[in-house]
């Protein structure tokens, strides 16, 4: 249930902030997604929940595909699709620009440092096309928020309601879901 709530929170944020969310004005709401562990049930559910709520999910094996998309510059990745949303008569495309499992070189997953490095790579690739940062947990979300999203005023959504993420809401952290 929490996974769907996280996705709905992101969608509600887009609708509430439609006038300012599209940072470069291209009509595409681009988001990046930090995936904790591709084989972990919580990670699978959270990825599916976000993709389902935003309409970017593609059905696979009876559910929304939770496979990392890698980079998706043109919206043609096979594991996600572009979605359309209408906000007060204005239509936006929602696109998952990039997603990856946050696994470090030692094999540890849900890795905050890897997420902090990933946001730097994604920023170099996508720049102001990134309108939202989404993470399967607050540890990775806070790493991306502190490394890039906070200074660039990009809303970041995590999961777990860690105390640092709750405190960061006053600094622009978009939201978090409590387990």
Language model segments and positions:
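A residue-level marker of the well-folded mature domains of exported/periplasmic proteins
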Residues: 1-179
């Amino acid at each position: 249930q929490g996974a769907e709530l996280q996705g709905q929170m992101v969608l509600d944020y887009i609708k509430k902030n439609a006038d300012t969310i599209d940072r470069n004005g291209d009509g595409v709401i681009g988001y990046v997604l930090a995936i904790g562990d591709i084989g972990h049930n919580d990670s699978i559910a959270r990825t599916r929940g976000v993709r389902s709520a935003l309409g970017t999910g593609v059905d696979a094996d009876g559910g929304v595909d939770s496979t990392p998309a890698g980079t998706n510059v043109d919206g043609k990745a096979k594991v996600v699709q572009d979605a359309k949303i209408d906000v007060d008569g204005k239509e936006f495309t929602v696109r998952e620009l990039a997603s990856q499992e946050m696994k470090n070189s030692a094999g540890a997953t849900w890795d905050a440092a890897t997420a902090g490095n990933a946001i730097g790579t994604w920023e170099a690739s996508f720049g102001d096309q990134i309108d939202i940062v989404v993470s399967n947990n607050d540890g990775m979300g806070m790493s991306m928020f502190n490394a890039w999203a906070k200074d660039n005023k990009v809303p970041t959504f995590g999961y777990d309601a860690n105390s640092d993420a709750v405190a960061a809401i006053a600094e622009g952290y978009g939201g978090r879901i409590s387990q």
